Each structure stands twice: as C-alpha cells, then as structure tokens.
C-alpha cells in the first residue's frame, strides 16, 4: 500500500531571522550607549573602595607589590617583544605607500630622531591595563612635503580624567581633564579634549566605554596578603623582642595614676622597644621569650600570590611539585599564558587601528576608503622547526631536477606566508612597507 504523501510545511522565518525586505530597517541605532549601573553597582563596580579615583589609588598602590610588578613586567615584555608591523590594505602601490607612511609615523623598528617612539603607545596602553582606561592626545605637525605627520602623543593619565562626556546618543564626546601643570603653578580644571583628537585604550570594555582594571580580581588577594604580612611582621617582632612584663606593688590599684603610668610604660616599650625605661625602686620590668613556634605563613602567602597571578592571566606560580618546590614545564607555561598575551596584543592593536591610524591617513589621503592595520606576529619555535623539516622534504624532492631554482621558488611561493617568513624568505610587500622614510616625512621644526 502506497504511503500517503505529507503536505510540505510552509517555511517561516525563525527566531533571529529577518525578511530581506526589512534589511534597510537595520540601519541606524535605536539603543543608546547606557551606563552599566544598578543598585550598588556604579559603572560596573560594586565595591565603594574601588569606585572612581579612589579605586585608581588602590590600583596604584598595588604596583608596589612584587608579584603584581613581576607579572606586569612579564606581560608587557612579551607584548613588546612580538614582531609588530603595518599591513597594507592591499598590494596596490598606493596602499603600500600609505602603509609605509604609517610604519614610519609609528616609529616601528626605528626610534631615531624624527620618528615617534613606538614604545610610548605601549606605555599608555599599560596604564589602561592597570587602571581600565587611558588616553593620549594626538598632535600633528606639517612635514617637509606638506603632509601632516605625527609630532607626538601627549599621555593623559587616568588620574587626570575627571569625566567622560557623552553626546545625546550615549557616545563618547570628550574627556574632561584637571590637574596641576608641571613646571609651574598653573592648575588646569575642566579642560575638554574632543574624543576625535585622542587615541583611547580601554581594557575589558563591555561596550559602554568603561574599561575595567586587570587588577580588579586581584584586589581581594592583595588586601589579604597585605594584612597577613603586617601580622607576620608583628608576630616576628614579638618573637625577637619578647613579651614585656611589668611587676608592680600590690598597693597599686586599677584606675590610679600609678596604674595608668604602668600601662604607658608597657605601651611605649611595645611601640619603641629600643628606648630606655625609668622605673620606681619597687617596680620590676622584664621580657618573656615565647616558647611556641610561629605558624608557617608561607603557604598562605603563596596562595595569595598565586591568586594575584591568576587574576592577571599568569599561572606560573600555581603549579607545585613535592616538598613545596614550585616549578613548571616551559611548554606548559607558554600554553597557560599565551592566550592572555595574544588577547592583550589584539586589544592594543585594535585601539591603534580604530583611533589612531585613520587620523593619520585621512588628512593626507582624504579620498582613502581603506586603511592599513597594525598587526603582530608571535615568535614560535615550533613553526620554524616544522617549516625547516618541510623545506628539507621539498629540497629532496627537486634535488635531481635540472632547473632547481625555478621549481624551488615555485614551491616556496606555495607555502603559507607565516611558514615562508619562518624560513627567512623575503616578503616583498612587507619590505616595501618597512623601507626607511625619506626626507619628505621629516619634521620642518624640531619636536618640543
């Protein structure tokens, strides 16, 4: 018996789909940028201690912690050590020329006279990583050929940013600054810098133009560690000096002047044990050595150090072996931290590509519709090893050919670009971008 045919179901748009005729409705924004505040949460922060500039002060104090500083040095050492370069929008000669101009303006691979130091941008981004947000004012000057070139970027420290001003749609409009001018007695208050004249770095931005410090999750561990160190120092002092005891006559009653004087003597010794003591003839002062051993506080300190490191994306001091010795395999260490480093490098490059590069290109190429981009390449030993092995196989495959150079070149050109660079093959486009700038890009006046 033939099966009864089923009527095909009518296709209807599912959740999240859109009718092609309604595509134009996607243009424009209906939802303004809104503050991420609710109840005790103010701009993503629920702890009053960490709200506003009071929070910035806490993060600044944390920089004196050895574990925090060590982690920051490692993170930004890795970020800076990557191979940074400017990638043109295409292989078109004009796009390559624009990329070469940006490469020269950013001072990549060259911090000589007439070039802006690329490391200054990293210093500004490091402040954003520590405090959540940092910025720099873009200052252009006229070059020898009439082009507007980068004169300098004036760092704007988070301590000097009083407020971010927004437009009616909730988008950032300006930075409101205040602070004392160095080298003079002038105090600037309410200075507004348009957002388009700045390069802004935000760490862990949620879309509301409110960054969050990378140290935020490390604060509880830092506070506990700080309190623990004070207790350890106080306990060690008691073990070294002893507990003071003062024997007084039985006639001295509580609440009398003599009783208060006895309390003051003991108190002064605790605060200043090296000072001398004057006692009445029938009073006796002594110190008692503590016989019990101090508790081992190292595991607690190690725990909080590990918590601080984990909050910053580094896990090197959480892997422990027997006998309390800390160690970690190099390969495992790289796997634990590499993604943290790469994500920060992308965050840095995205801000430069969004807020800085277009502002250097458009004044000189007003009709430009595409821009070069700052990108990076991590040094990976495994890539070179694999490429070298593959190259050996390719050479062996064509070694008996009468026309080795032509075939070898064709094989090399077929390799992925990253593998060719690992082999040391010259990338003609990248070399054209990295050519030293000529005199047209030099300053017509000396940089201040």
From Swiss-Prot:
GO terms for cellular component: viral capsid. It comes from the Viruses. It is found in: Virion. Its main location: virion. Keywords: Capsid protein, Viral capsid assembly, Viral genome packaging, Viral release from host cell, Virion. Residues 1-25 are annotated as: Disordered. InterPro entries: P23-45_portal (IPR054117). The keyword Magnesium does not apply. It holds the Pfam family P23-45_portal_barrel. The keyword Lipoprotein does not apply. Belongs to the P23virus portal protein family. Homododecamer. Interacts with the capsid protein. Interacts with the terminase large subunit; this interaction allows the packaging of viral DNA. Forms the portal vertex of the capsid. This portal plays critical roles in head assembly, genome packaging, neck/tail attachment, and genome ejection. The portal protein multimerizes as a single ring-shaped homododecamer arranged around a central channel. Forms the portal vertex of the capsid. This portal plays critical roles in head assembly, genome packaging, neck/tail attachment, and genome ejection. This is Portal protein. It comes from Thermus phage G20c.
């Amino acid at each position: 018996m033939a099966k009864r045919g089923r009527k095909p179901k009518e296709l209807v748009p599912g959740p999240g789909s859109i009718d092609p005729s309604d595509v134009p409705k996607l243009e424009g924004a209906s939802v303004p940028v809104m503050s991420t505040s609710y109840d005790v949460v103010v701009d993503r922060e629920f702890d009053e201690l960490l709200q506003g500039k009071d929070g910035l002060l806490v993060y600044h104090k944390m920089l004196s912690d050895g574990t925090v500083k060590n982690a920051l040095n490692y993170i930004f050492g890795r970020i800076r050590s990557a191979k940074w370069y400017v990638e043109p929008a295409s292989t078109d000669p004009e796009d390559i020329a624009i990329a070469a101009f940006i490469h020269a303006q950013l001072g990549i691979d060259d911090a000589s006279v007439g070039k802006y130091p690329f490391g200054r941008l990293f210093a500004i981004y490091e402040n954003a990583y520590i405090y959540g947000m940092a910025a720099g004012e873009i200052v252009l000057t006229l070059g020898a050929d009439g082009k507007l070139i980068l004169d300098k970027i004036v760092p704007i420290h988070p301590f000097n940013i009083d407020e971010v001003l927004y437009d009616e749609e909730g988008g950032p409009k300006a930075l409101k600054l205040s602070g004392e001018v160095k080298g003079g007695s002038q105090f600037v208050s309410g200075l507004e810098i348009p957002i388009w004249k700045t390069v802004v770095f935000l760490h862990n931005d949620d879309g509301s133009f409110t960054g969050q410090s990378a140290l935020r999750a490390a604060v509880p561990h830092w506070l506990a560690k700080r309190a623990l160190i004070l207790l350890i120092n106080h306990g060690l002092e008691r073990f070294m000096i002893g507990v003071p005891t003062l024997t007084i006559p039985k006639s001295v009653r509580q609440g009398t002047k003599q009783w208060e004087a006895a309390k003051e003597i003991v108190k002064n010794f605790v605060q200043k044990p090296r000072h001398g003591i004057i006692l009445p003839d029938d009073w006796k002062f002594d110190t008692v050595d503590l016989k019990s051993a101090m508790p081992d506080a190292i595991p607690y300190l190690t725990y909080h150090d590990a918590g601080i490191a984990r909050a910053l994306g580094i896990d090197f001091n959480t892997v422990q072996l027997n006998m309390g010795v800390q160690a970690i395999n190099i390969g495992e260490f790289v796997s634990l931290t590499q993604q943290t480093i790469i994500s920060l490098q992308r965050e840095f490059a995205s801000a430069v590509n969004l807020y800085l590069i277009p502002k250097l290109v458009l004044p000189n190429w007003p009709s430009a519709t595409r821009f070069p981009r700052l990108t990076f390449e991590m040094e990976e030993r495994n890539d070179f090893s694999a490429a070298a092995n593959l190259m050996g196989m390719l050479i062996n495959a064509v070694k008996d050919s009468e026309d080795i150079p032509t075939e070898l070149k064709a094989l090399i050109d077929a390799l992925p670009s990253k593998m060719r660079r690992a082999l040391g093959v010259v990338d003609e486009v990248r070399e054209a971008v990295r050519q030293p700038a000529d005199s047209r890009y030099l300053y017509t006046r000396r940089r201040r």
